[in-house]
UniProtKB/Swiss-Prot annotation:
SUPFAM superfamilies: Dehydroquinate synthase-like (SSF56796). It is found in: Cytoplasm. This is 3-dehydroquinate synthase. GO terms for molecular function: 3-dehydroquinate synthase activity; metal ion binding; nucleotide binding. One of its GO terms (cellular component) is cytoplasm. GO terms for biological process: amino acid biosynthetic process; aromatic amino acid family biosynthetic process; chorismate biosynthetic process. Zn(2+) binds at residues 185, 248, 264. The gene is aroB. Binds 1 divalent metal cation per subunit. Can use either Co(2+) or Zn(2+).
Length: 359
């Protein structure tokens, strides 16, 4: 098991990464929060695979558990779904010291975190991420949010978990499409923060695709450490943390304009290719860098170009993004593998030109 610590203005928590950690949940949980009762928020598919085993494990250690099973999908990450959860917490007599365990992927983590942050002004949050994307990205850093009015993550806050338990054994049951989505975030982290990880992904593509336990634990740990290091410098996303949004400006617009039928990982993959091409157009990086990134993305079965887009609608969606400041769309652009920069004064014709090239 590997452990990564985050220290945020005196508030500390750990990200634990290893195989079969779900079977140690009770012990690891009690090391962070003394408790004898928890609420587990999950979805139908994850509950079917892990719910019964986790519930039995918790009960064997004297921890009473209420499992709340939600429908699957980004479309359900809403205020209405949060409002559906609150009465169940009240009826269960959940108190301010009753932990909420988020068992699932990014949608469950975001929604559970939003509920934990707002129920009784905040209850302990524990992430049990089961998807690759959530293990390397969404469970780390404290962003919690729901979608509203067709805009992704527009209602939310920063609310740090007390513990993250990333069981790499969960990746064995992860569908190929979901695995690829997680790889998009790993590639993103390598592109902005580690040329060594970028090269490792290029030279060990097949071992990663085969989900070699040793390789996966290594790259998950490296990716988590990159994000943790950035979050510790800028918890509330006012400065350097913005570089974690590489690929997300276009990515979120693609998700929103598709009514969230476009997966997050695929959208971010396309967004990274767009950002790299825009970087080349602006003379910020070599064309070879963009080509290497596109090849790596394609090698993991992710798309590099959008389908059936209306560039004007994409631009409009970008203006609704949280990253807009003083009416200016903020882009994260690439200089070379492992180094990115924040850019705001990008001209609309340049954006439209690259979008047209990618159609």
């Amino acid at each position: 098991m590997k452990s990564i610590g985050l220290n945020l203005s005196g508030r500390e928590y750990k990200i634990l990464i290893g195989s079969d950690l779900l079977s140690e949940t009770a012990t690891l949980l009690r090391e962070a929060i003394p408790c004898d009762r928890v609420v587990v928020i999950t979805n139908i598919d994850i509950n079917r695979i892990y719910g019964k085993k986790l519930k039995k494990h918790l009960e064997s250690k004297g921890i009473e558990s209420l499992f709340l099973e939600l429908p699957e999908g980004e479309i359900h990450k809403t205020l209405d779904m949060a409002a559906h959860i609150y009465p169940q917490l009240i009826n269960h007599f959940a108190e301010r010291n009753t932990p909420i365990l988020a068992l699932g992927g990014g949608v469950i983590g975001d929604l559970s975190g939003f509920v934990a942050a707002t129920y009784q002004r905040g209850v302990p949050l524990i992430h049990l991420p089961t998807s690759l994307l959530s293990q390397v990205d969404s469970s780390i850093g404290g962003k919690v949010a729901v979608n509203h009015g067709g805009v992704k993550n527009i209602v939310g806050s920063f609310y740090q978990p007390r513990l993250v338990i990333a069981d790499t054994g969960c990746l064995k049951t992860l569908p190929e499409k979901e695995f690829a989505c997680g790889m998009a975030e790993i590639i993103k982290s390598a592109a902005i923060g580690s040329s060594e990880l970028f090269r490792m992904l290029e030279t060990n593509t097949q071992a990663v695709k085969d989900r070699s336990p040793e390789v996966m634990e290594d790259i998950i740990s490296q990716t988590a450490a990159i994000k943790a290091g950035i979050v510790c410098q800028d918890e509330t996303d006012r400065g350097i943390r913005n570089i974690l949004n590489f690929g997300h400006t276009l990515g979120h617009a693609l998700e929103s304009t598709s009514s969230f039928s476009q997966s997050h990982g695929a959208a971010v993959a396309i967004g990274m290719c767009f950002a790299a091409r825009l970087s080349v157009r602006l003379g910020l990086c070599e064309n070879e860098t963009a080509l290497r990134l596109e090849k790596l993305i394609a090698d993991f079965g992710l798309p590099t170009n959008p389908k059936d887009i209306d560039p004007d609608k994409i631009i409009e969606a970008m203006h609704h993004d949280k990253k807009v400041s003083d009416g200016r769309i903020r882009f994260i652009l690439l200089k070379r593998p492992g180094e990115a920069l924040i850019a705001e004064n990008i001209l609309k014709p340049d954006v439209l030109s690259v979008l047209e090239e990618m159609k």
